[in-house]
Design a protein with these regions (language model features):
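DPxDG-like acidic metal-binding loop motif
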Residues: 19-78
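Short, Asp-centered acidic motifs that coordinate Mg2+ and/or phosphate
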Residues: 7, 57, 142-143
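An extended, acidic
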Residues: 85-166
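Acidic active-site catalytic centers that drive phospho-/nucleotidyl reactions
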Residues: 11-12, 28-31, 35, 142, ...
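Short loop/edge segments at beta-strand edges and connector loops
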Residues: 10-12, 81, 128
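N-terminal subdomain of lithium-sensitive/metallo-dependent phosphomonoesterases centered on the IMPase/IPPase/PAP
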Residues: 1-30
Length: 166
C-alpha cells in the first residue's frame, strides 16, 4: 500500500501491483517446503528486489540456524552483518559439491556428467534449496546444482552469490 508503483510476486501468493513496474519484489516465504514439512531445518525465506528485471537485492533467512544473508548490488554480501566471500578453491578435487534433487538431471540425460563431478570433488552433500546456495555465498561450499528453479527461487540468490564474489 505504501508503494503502489511496486509489483509484488510470490510463490505462494501470486502477484499484485502494475505488471510493468520498474521495481518488483519477489518473495518465497518457505523455500524448501519439503524440508520444512518433514522437520528438516534446511529451509529458508527468500526476498529479492528487482529493478528493471535485474535482481539488485537479495535476502536469505535461515530460521533454524539464525542466519540472515543480505546481498546488494555494489555492496557485497553479509551474514548477520559480517562480510562473507565465496571460497577460492583452486582445484575441483578440493571442492565441496552440494545439490538438490538429482532426478531432473537424470531425466535431462546429464547422469554421466553428474556422476563424474561427484567422483572428482572432495565432498558431496545433498544440501537442497536455498541452504546450498547460502553455503556457497558464505564460503562454506564451492558448487551448488539446483536443476529446477523459478524466479522466486533464484532472484534472491543471485545478488547474494555475486556480492560474495561468485
Amino acid at each position: 500500500q505504501r508503494y503502489p508503483e511496486h509489483r509484488i510476486v510470490g510463490e505462494e501468493g501470486g502477484s499484485s501491483g502494475p505488471a510493468a513496474a520498474a521495481r518488483q519484489w519477489v518473495l518465497d516465504p518457505i523455500d524448501g517446503t519439503k524440508s520444512f514439512v518433514h522437520g528438516v531445518p534446511l529451509f529458508g525465506t527468500l526476498i529479492a528486489l528487482l529493478e528493471d528485471g535485474r535482481p539488485v537485492l537479495g535476502v536469505i533467512h535461515l530460521p533454524a540456524t539464525g542466519e540472515l544473508m543480505v546481498g546488494a548490488q555494489g555492496q557485497g554480501t553479509t551474514v548477520n552483518g559480517r562480510p562473507v566471500r565465496v571460497r577460492a578453491t583452486a582445484r575441483l578435487e578440493e571442492a565441496t559439491f552440494a545439490f538438490t534433487d538429482s532426478a531432473p538431471l537424470h531425466r535431462l540425460g546429464l547422469t554421466s556428467g553428474f556422476l563424474e563431478l561427484q567422483r572428482r570433488v572432495r565432498i558431496v552433500r545433498g544440501w537442497g534449496d536455498c541452504y546450498g546456495h547460502f553455503l556457497v555465498a558464505a564460503g562454506r561450499a564451492d558448487i551448488m546444482i539446483d536443476p529446477v528453479l523459478s524466479l522466486w527461487d533464484v532472484a534472491a540468490l543471485k545478488p547474494c552469490v555475486e556480492g560474495a564474489g561468485g
